[in-house]
Amino acid sequence: MSLTGCLPPRPPCSMRRRTSGGGASVSPVVAMASTAGVGGIGNPTPRGKKPFAPWREVPPQVTHTLPPEKKEVFDSLEGWAADTILPYLKPVEESWQPQDHLPDPRSPSFGDEVAALRERAAGLPDDHLVCLVGDMVTEEALPTYQTMLNTMDGGVRDETGAGGSAWAVWTRAWAAEENRHGDLMNKYLYLTGRVDMRQVEKTIQYLIGSGMDPRTENDPYMGFIYTTFQERATSISHGNTARHAGRHGDAALARVCGTVAADEKRHEAAYAAIVAKLFEVDPDYTVRAFARMMRRKVAMPARLMYDGADDRLFARFAAVAQRLGVYTAADYAGIIEFLVARWGVPGLAAGLSGEGRRAQDFVCSLGPRFRRMEERAQEAAKRAPPAAAAPFSWIHGRQVQL
């Protein structure tokens, strides 16, 4: 997962309301210490009571910055989305289902199949299990991601919950495809017997209860850039997890992770196509939205991960993923470079304002800049003492090197 998404705790601050330029609203910042087990966002509870989410400071949240005239852009793309984006979806009857990759409970050999699965999984090291659980927990927070898409302005949200626009159909069908990922990985981990499922399930509930602020300001330009980045990041993460599983002798788990990675790759292609179309019809605003998104850095959707005890659970999970090469800072830089090239940002010329040209220069410089930072960090890491270990409740409190 992206290390840039792991933000250090900030000191408490007082309740205040501010207004950003352009009429955008900024939510109040609630004074909350990062103290686990005391209370939650918007739901103060007496000390000792279990909250819906851990106490966390909520930073200023900028909302609804999309200029009203930009809605016309998405209205004009409705037919294009129906013809170009919806075909990225697979018909349900042609789609894989979790049961296709799991022992069949109707089969007389079900017990033997489960025993074989557990025997293969016994060879997975604890640090790989941590990455697998972290990926699964991220997938299981799907309600949050569908909610995020339906907060976007510009006429792309599903206004009724069963809307007929191409944008609404896409969001629901995308979520339905994504839902299989967490289901499959959850059931697989349950059958392995290697993890503390109650702790994992608590983590999922806490994460959904905590929500996420992707800092996209309800702007679909920024929102679709964010989702493109995230789909590529998850495809990389699941693909690397698949390779690790294969190296440790669990070919079935490798197929599970590879299947999920392939779905994420297809979804990435759809979201990237949307942004490419926006660059075609509105290059100036789109490149400025790209720069705004990257200045905020792309926070991973599971960065509010919490298991009821560990305030730094995501940071530790991310450190393990970085050390194993499941998802690294180099991957983050690589995604930026890929998207800059995919959307033809260096070649933009006509139609750019002065601000647009500055945004173009900024995003084109980011990939190389992050790579240099990563190279320096790697050199420093070689000279540093071995990283400390930390316990993970997901694996019954066993220690894993960070």
Swiss-Prot record:
Annotated compartments: Plastid, Chloroplast
EC number: 1.14.19.-
Transit peptide, residue positions per record: 1-32
Manner of cofactor binding, per the entry note: Binds 2 Fe(2+) ions per subunit.
Keywords: Chloroplast, Fatty acid biosynthesis, Fatty acid metabolism, Iron, Lipid biosynthesis, Lipid metabolism, Metal-binding, Oxidoreductase, Plastid, Transit peptide
Cofactor: Fe(2+)
Region (Disordered): 1-66
Pathway where it operates: Lipid metabolism; fatty acid metabolism
Predominant subcellular localization, coarse grouping: plastid
Binding positions (Fe cation 1): E139, E178, H181, E264
SUPFAM superfamilies: Ferritin-like
Gene Ontology molecular function: metal ion binding; stearoyl-[ACP] desaturase activity
Transmembrane segments: none
Enzyme class: oxidoreductase
UniProt key word Ubl conjugation: no
Family matches, as InterPro entries: Fatty_acid_desaturase-2, Ferritin-like_SF, RNR-like
Any one GO BP annotation for this protein: fatty acid metabolic process
PANTHER family given in the database record: ACYL- ACYL-CARRIER-PROTEIN DESATURASE-RELATED, ACYL-[ACYL-CARRIER-PROTEIN] DESATURASE 3, CHLOROPLASTIC
Family membership: Belongs to the fatty acid desaturase type 2 family.
Entry function: Introduces a cis double bond in the acyl chain of an acyl-[acyl-carrier protein].
Protein name per its UniProtKB record: Acyl-[acyl-carrier-protein] desaturase 3, chloroplastic
Native organism: Oryza sativa subsp. japonica (Rice)
